[in-house]
């Protein structure tokens, strides 16, 4: 997408042919800053500290982390150690596991002398596939927005999104935002309500920043505003991304998504989830009890970053000293509250049957594996 009118991706191989460039998302929206990753540990740290974040981008970064690891040591033991180190960085995002499994499988049949080249090639392939997948998600989702506009052509289509499932969460385009960008570029008038998404404020810091750079009309709202907007007919469509979807359609996404889905269900607002097929965990059915929910540090809740009147970036405490804090990174929205899924293969119901209809090979393969695991 565009930054100051220049097309950018979120991750790339630098001109030296081996170091990996990223946008440091911890500096946004106050500073656009890039970073250079040169080792396995730097890639792992970028994921853990959320310099890169969003399930698809985490998967791509981890793949490049494996490639960086192979530069230092391409032995079988090093492959397993790099895989395990990166897998431990963010437990909720299934794309991380998927990308690492793909690299490990490729490297397991590649001679050590060729593993560096092969790892970079596979990581680049995953990145390019992500761009095409997000573009396809955008095309399918745009038709939902087009349909809403045809029903009421005299005003913009009002959308609500939570967290950041945008360009910054993928290599390009985004998942939840891809339909919005394509609709905007096609001349369909849209307006986006952007949840601030505490405690890390990915909506206020990231989604609003990227929408603004692309020229998409938007309004940032406090997290608890969505229900009020829906009650008063100010939201035509809620669309979010996801870090993991189970085989039966339960959705893990940034904390607060479940509450938005409840409000949408109560007010009759369509609630769609945009995702690539790689985000589906075909071996898991019950998301509420089966998806591991990441807990993060207290300081994300007790402190907040902002810019002072004289331009300084400061972090200040907002919670009374001594107050205990709980910081759950994600929640799970049951499939019954989700209108449907927007995927690279089209739209489907939020159900086991709906997902299996779009991804029959994966569904059949995982069903066989579950039977084998239960035997």
UniProtKB/Swiss-Prot annotation:
Keyword annotations of the record: Amino-acid biosynthesis, Isomerase, Methionine biosynthesis
Q: Which domain of life is it from?
A: Bacteria
Q: What class of enzyme is it?
A: isomerase
Name one matching Pfam family: IF-2B
InterPro entries attached to this UniProt entry: IF-2B-related, IF-M1Pi, IF_2B-like_C, Initiation_fac_2B_a/b/d, M1Pi_N, NagB/RpiA_transferase-like
What positions are marked as the site Transition state stabilizer?
A: 163
From the Swiss-Prot or TrEMBL record, what is one GO molecular function term?
S-methyl-5-thioribose-1-phosphate isomerase activity
**NCBIfam families from the xrefs?**
eIF-2B_rel, PRK05720.1, salvage_mtnA
Family to which this protein belongs: Belongs to the eIF-2B alpha/beta/delta subunits family. MtnA subfamily.
Output the HAMAP family linked to this UniProt entry.
Salvage_MtnA
Role, per record: Catalyzes the interconversion of methylthioribose-1-phosphate (MTR-1-P) into methylthioribulose-1-phosphate (MTRu-1-P).
Q: Mind telling me what this protein is named?
A: Methylthioribose-1-phosphate isomerase
Protein source organism: Rhodospirillum centenum (strain ATCC 51521 / SW)
Q: Recall the taxonomic lineage recorded for the source organism.
A: Bacteria, Pseudomonadati, Pseudomonadota, Alphaproteobacteria, Rhodospirillales
State the gene name recorded for this protein: mtnA
């Amino acid at each position: 997408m565009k930054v100051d009118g220049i097309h950018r991706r979120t991750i790339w191989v630098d001109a030296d042919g081996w170091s990996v460039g990223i946008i440091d998302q911890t500096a946004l929206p106050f500073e656009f800053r890039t970073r250079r990753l040169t080792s396995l540990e730097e890639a792992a740290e970028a994921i853990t500290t959320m310099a890169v974040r969003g399930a698809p981008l985490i998967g791509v970064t981890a793949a490049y982390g494996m490639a960086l690891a192979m530069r230092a040591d391409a032995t079988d033991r090093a492959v397993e150690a790099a895989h395990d180190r990166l897998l431990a960085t963010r437990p909720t995002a299934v794309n991380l596991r998927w990308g690492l499994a793909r690299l490990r499988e490729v490297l397991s049949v590649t001679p050590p002398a060729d593993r560096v080249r092969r790892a970079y090639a596979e990581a680049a392939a995953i990145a390019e596939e992500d761009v095409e997948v997000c573009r396809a998600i955008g095309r399918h989702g745009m038709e939902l927005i087009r349909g809403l506009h045809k029903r009421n052509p005299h005003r913009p289509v009002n959308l609500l999104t939570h967290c950041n499932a945008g360009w910054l969460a993928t290599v390009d385009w985004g998942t939840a935002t891809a339909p919005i960008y394509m609709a905007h570029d096609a001349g369909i008038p849209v307006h986006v309500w952007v949840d601030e998404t505490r405690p890390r404020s990915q909506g206020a810091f990231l989604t609003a920043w990227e929408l603004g750079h692309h020229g998409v009309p938007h309004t940032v709202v406090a997290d608890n505003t969505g229900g009020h907007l829906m009650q008063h007919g100010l939201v035509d469509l809620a669309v979010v991304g996801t870090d993991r979807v189970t085989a039966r359609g339960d959705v893990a996404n940034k904390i607060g998504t479940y509450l938005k889905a409840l409000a949408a269900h109560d007010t009759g607002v369509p609630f769609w989830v945009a995702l690539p097929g790689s985000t589906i965990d075909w071996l898991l059915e019950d998301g509420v009890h089966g998806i591991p929910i990441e807990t993060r540090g207290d300081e994300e809740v007790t402190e907040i970053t902002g810019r002072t009147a004289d331009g300084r970036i400061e972090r200040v405490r907002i919670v009374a000293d001594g107050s205990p804090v709980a910081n759950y990174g994600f929640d799970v929205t049951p499939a019954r509250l989700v209108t449907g899924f927007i995927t690279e293969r089209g739209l489907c119901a939020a159900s086991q049957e709906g997902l299996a209809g779009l991804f029959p090979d994966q569904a059949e393969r995982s069903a066989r594996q579950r039977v084998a695991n239960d035997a």
